């Protein structure tokens, strides 16, 4: 019997023997985005509370009688019966009709991000006479600001069935990133930084989510198979999504991560209590970039593994989440070193207007220059009760730089301080000026700081 068969059998057996209550309000990047976008201007559903804003869509707690179970064509009939023409065709009405009739949620995020930076030319130290023949002369990189990033991220979740046997949900999320003029990777080289100035430093296309989830009755267990990324759970509300919160590489994701941007696999999620969640899973180790879905890699017998634990308490101050992620990646041609990494995240609402968060993460090996990071920050949402999209945030990240992974690094550390203000313009459009200050750039000993100015325009439908 092969390893794949044993692992899949164990996951299925555990899913059927677990009988605990399902967990709620645990952060998931794409599910939260769908939930947030589909509650804008929602006049039918009640106004979501602070706790619901971080929830995944809850499952039915009672078994549905066979006489009330929906047929295969029921969503089509229900959608026609909504009679959109009578109520006026609009984005809100269309999304509400899809949600009510077909159990479908759709989110479209499109952002344009110009970034100005200084310095613009990298520094090449002069070699002394004793260095000739022993040290290579560093190449000088020059970049002309601004660099323009165009990022499009559509997401969708479709409830295929909802019966006494549970609920089946298909979820997809795709990220497409293009650049005009310079890209962020070139700008980072010119500034001589260890970390990038945004989450996607070069042109990318990522199938970050292409999964089917079987949620078992009574919210006990869920089993997910397909292509997914650990970026979806590794973080908190504002330090894991460049289109919503912070922009810099160290504050918009886990900068030490060596796991895939999207790869085929499966994971099982179990909830011992309503406020805790446990997850264990595996992925194909070969697909690092996630730019396509590579079914043939599953037969190559190399897999990455992860375990995840989350606690989401609710106290007198507000809801919070505290999580730990452990993962192991295998050595493959696309990543020539086996690594083991960890990420500890904490977030807490101090009040309905103030959200604080922190992260400590690290990784073994020499895959990327940053091997440890410590970050913390705070975000105030809708401080003046003007627009639900209004945000004010400030955060700081301290990054340790592994000199073996970055031979040109002159310092063992690099610090970034970032602040942004999102200004909502109606329910869908927002603008966010952002400022990044880098203290002691790791690759530039002759400069003590570098600066990045950005203005993010985001359309979230």
Swiss-Prot record:
The keyword Membrane applies. One of its GO terms (cellular component) is pore complex. It is found in: Cell outer membrane. Keywords: Amino-acid transport, Cell outer membrane, Ion transport, Membrane, Porin, Signal, Transmembrane, Transmembrane beta strand, Transport, Virulence. InterPro entries: Carb-sel_porin_OprB, OprB_sf. Residues 1-22 form the signal peptide. GO terms for molecular function: porin activity. It is a multi-pass membrane protein. Its main location: membrane. It holds the Pfam family OprB. The keyword Membrane applies. It comes from the Bacteria. One of its GO terms (biological process) is carbohydrate transport. Facilitates L-arginine uptake, as part of the AaxABC system. The arginine uptake by the bacterium in the macrophage may be a virulence factor against the host innate immune response. Belongs to the OprB family. This is Porin AaxA. It comes from Chlamydia trachomatis serovar L2 (strain ATCC VR-902B / DSM 19102 / 434/Bu).
């Amino acid at each position: 019997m092969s390893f794949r068969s044993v692992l899949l059998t164990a996951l299925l057996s555990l899913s059927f023997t677990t009988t605990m209550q399902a967990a709620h309000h645990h952060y998931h990047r794409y599910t939260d985005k769908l939930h947030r976008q589909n509650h804008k201007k929602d006049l039918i559903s009640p106004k979501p509370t602070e706790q619901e804003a971080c929830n995944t869509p809850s499952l039915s707690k009672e078994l549905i009688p066979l006489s009330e179970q929906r047929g295969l064509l029921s969503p089509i009939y229900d959608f026609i019966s909504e009679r959109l023409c009578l109520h006026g065709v609009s984005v809100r009405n269309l999304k509400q009709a899809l949600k009510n009739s077909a159990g479908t949620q759709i989110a479209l995020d499109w952002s344009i991000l110009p970034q100005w930076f200084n310095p613009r030319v990298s520094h090449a130290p002069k070699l002394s006479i004793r260095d000739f023949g022993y040290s290579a002369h560093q190449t000088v990189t020059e970049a002309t600001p601004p660099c323009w990033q165009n990022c499009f991220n559509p997401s969708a979740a479709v409830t295929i069935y909802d019966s006494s046997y549970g609920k089946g949900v298909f979820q997809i999320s795709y990220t497409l990133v293009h650049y005009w003029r310079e890209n962020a990777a070139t700008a980072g080289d010119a500034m001589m930084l260890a970390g990038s100035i945004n989450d996607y430093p070069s042109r990318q296309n990522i199938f970050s989510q292409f999964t089917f989830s079987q949620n078992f009755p009574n919210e006990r267990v869920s089993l997910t198979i397909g292509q997914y990324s650990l970026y979806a759970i590794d973080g908190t509300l504002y330090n894991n999504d460049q289109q919503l919160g912070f922009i810099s590489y160290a504050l918009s994701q886990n900068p030490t991560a060596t796991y895939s941007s999207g790869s085929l696999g499966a994971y099982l999620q179990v909830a011992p209590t309503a406020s805790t969640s446990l997850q264990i899973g595996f992925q194909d180790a070969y697909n690092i970039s996630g730019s396509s879905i590579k079914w043939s890699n599953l037969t190559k017998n190399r897999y990455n593994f992860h375990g995840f634990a989350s606690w989401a308490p609710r106290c007198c101050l507000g809801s919070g989440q505290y999580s730990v992620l452990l993962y192991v990646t295998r050595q493959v041609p696309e990543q020539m070193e086996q690594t083991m990494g960890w990420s500890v995240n904490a977030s807490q609402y101090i009040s309905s207007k103030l959200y604080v968060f922190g992260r400590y993460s690290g990784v073994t090996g020499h895959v990327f220059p940053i091997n440890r990071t410590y970050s913390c920050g705070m975000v105030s949402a809708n401080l003046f009760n003007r627009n639900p999209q209004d945000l004010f945030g400030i955060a700081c990240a301290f990054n340790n730089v592994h000199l073996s992974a970055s031979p040109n690094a002159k310092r063992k550390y690099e610090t970034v301080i970032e602040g942004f203000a999102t200004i909502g313009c109606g329910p869908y459009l927002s603008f966010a000026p952002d400022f990044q200050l880098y203290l002691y750039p790791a690759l530039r000993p002759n400069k003590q700081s570098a600066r990045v100015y950005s203005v993010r325009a985001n359309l979230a439908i």
